[in-house]
């Protein structure tokens, strides 16, 4: 069947069929650990970096780690998702140790043992735990960092590009880069 599909359909069907077979064979990529730390972004502002490690087929040797940092924009609007900032003297109140603590405790405990390949479920679990419209309980910076780190870990575990993991069957072409020519806000 695999050979027939490869000959009949689009060349990327090989990737899709092999990926589906791998996923059906066993749910191997289970979330093992998520941890976070405070780092400085390109403007010198504190931001959250999360690390998610998943187990592969051989739990003793297959540990795959994804990492993501989520710096904020220079200006934020009142309708944007809420970042958690410390509000203390460190970094003029812009520290993110509270968000880091949320990842290392609440989010970590909630996600350990979950199927990391089910990105939608991972995201929904974090959003449900937060329970606010603007993500002000856990912090959008904490939630997004873990979500992207998980996405990166899963793509590495399957040995595919991130855009193919997120795009599924419609990920036949690499996304076209886009950039701002004119932009507002503070810089």
Give, region by region, the residue ranges found by the protein language model:
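Intrinsic-disorder-associated, low-complexity terminal segments enriched in Asp/Asn/His/Tyr and depleted
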Residues: 2, 9-12
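Conserved phosphate/anionic-ligand binding catalytic regions in large, soluble enzymes, centered on
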Residues: 40-41, 45-48, 134-155, 176-187
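Methionine residue identity
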Residues: 1-4, 21
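Short, Gly/Pro- and small/polar-rich lid/capping loops
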Residues: 12-47
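Flexible glycine-/small-residue-enriched beta->alpha junction loops
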Residues: 64-71, 75-80, 163-187
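Short, hydrophobic/aliphatic alpha-helical segments
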Residues: 30, 54, 120-135, 168-178
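Metal- or metallocofactor-binding catalytic centers and their adjacent structured scaffolds
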Residues: 71-156, 160
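A short beta-strand signature
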Residues: 48-57
């Amino acid at each position: 069947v695999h050979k027939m599909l490869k000959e009949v359909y689009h060349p990327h069907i090989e990737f899709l069929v092999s990926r589906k077979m791998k996923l059906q064979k066993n749910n191997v990529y289970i979330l093992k650990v998520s941890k976070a730390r405070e780092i400085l972004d390109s403007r010198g502002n504190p931001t959250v970096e999360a690390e998610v490690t998943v187990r592969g087929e051989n739990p003793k040797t297959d540990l795959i780690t994804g990492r993501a940092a989520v710096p904020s924009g220079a200006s934020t609007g009142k309708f944007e998702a809420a970042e958690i900032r410390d509000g203390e003297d460190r970094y003029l109140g812009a520290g993110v140790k509270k968000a880091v603590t949320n990842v290392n405790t609440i989010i970590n405990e909630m996600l350990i043992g979950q199927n990391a390949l089910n990105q939608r479920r991972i995201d929904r679990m974090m959003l449900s735990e937060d329970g606010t419209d603007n993500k002000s309980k856990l912090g959008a910076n904490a939630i997004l960092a873990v979500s992207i780190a998980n996405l990166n870990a899963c793509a590495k575990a399957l040995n595919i590009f991130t855009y193919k993991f997120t795009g599924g069957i419609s990920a036949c072409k690499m996304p076209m880069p886009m950039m701002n020519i004119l932009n507002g806000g503070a810089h």
